[in-house]
From Swiss-Prot:
The keyword Translocase does not apply. It comes from Salinispora tropica (strain ATCC BAA-916 / DSM 44818 / JCM 13857 / NBRC 105044 / CNB-440). D-glyceraldehyde 3-phosphate binds at residue 177. In the presence of PdxT, forms a dodecamer of heterodimers. The keyword Lyase applies. This is Pyridoxal 5'-phosphate synthase subunit PdxS. PANTHER family: PYRIDOXAL 5'-PHOSPHATE SYNTHASE SUBUNIT SNZ1-RELATED (PTHR31829:SF0). Pathway: Cofactor biosynthesis; pyridoxal 5'-phosphate biosynthesis. It comes from the Bacteria.
Amino acid sequence: MPDSQTSNSSTNAPVTGTAHVKRGMAEMLKGGVIMDVVTAEQAKIAEDAGAVAVMALERVPSDIRAQGGVSRMSDPDMIDSIMDAVSIPVMAKVRIGHFVEAQILQSLGVDYVDESEVLTPADYANHVDKWAFTVPFVCGATNLGEALRRITEGAAMIRSKGEAGTGDVSNATTHMRGIRTEIRRLQSLPTDELYLAAKDLQAPYELVKEIAETGKLPVVLFTAGGIATPADAAMMMQLGAEGVFVGSGIFKSDNPAHRAAAIVKATTFHDDPETLAKISRGLGEAMVGINAGTLSQSDRLAERGR
């Protein structure tokens, strides 16, 4: 796996895009909440609520589902306005496989790029070569094999996918439990069986061996998709997530500022039921949402880019 990307050819210049640096940048977000925002005003609400970063996009996932059509990278002017409005890191999404959208976002100076299944895929066979960029990438995964393939391509952070835009946390739960269970299975295998496991996972043996030895991914593992309440966020943290992405669940609720702050606090105090009970009071109505079990196969965003 490459470990030395830099935008400066001088051997004495600091390396700005190595795997170590990019993964370290993602580590800085650990334990926090990343919120989808569509305006500078929403970005300020997220920052004031304690978000560690914001995801700039033109439509939250629930609106993408409702309105349909082709979803693409956001307008650079909109991304710039959000970057100007807040002091916390700003992420933005590109379509799966759309390396030119990624080049544009890197040139804008975003802090992280999310190669996202929420947008309409640009390439159904290939993902972006993330080693070719100095900016760190976030990618989604529904299982361990998918996570390892994205890491092999250069992802610096993995988020379990869930079903974005539904407000239904069930798929996020399934994906996080699945990834953690598969990691524990690798730990139980004798070394000579890891070769077959690597073949089954369609991932490099050395990466599989590392996970079997350490019991965790070599990058940060966040969760996403359907998280709408403080209890949802706390449950995902207790299941092994190292942080939380929240999309439609905040700004499609009755009181976005109050709910955003509550979800941030729940992520921090995820193992304290008394605090969770206190911050769950008086939040107003959560987003109405969609039962993920009723989605047709074509409407399941998590199936994209596997």
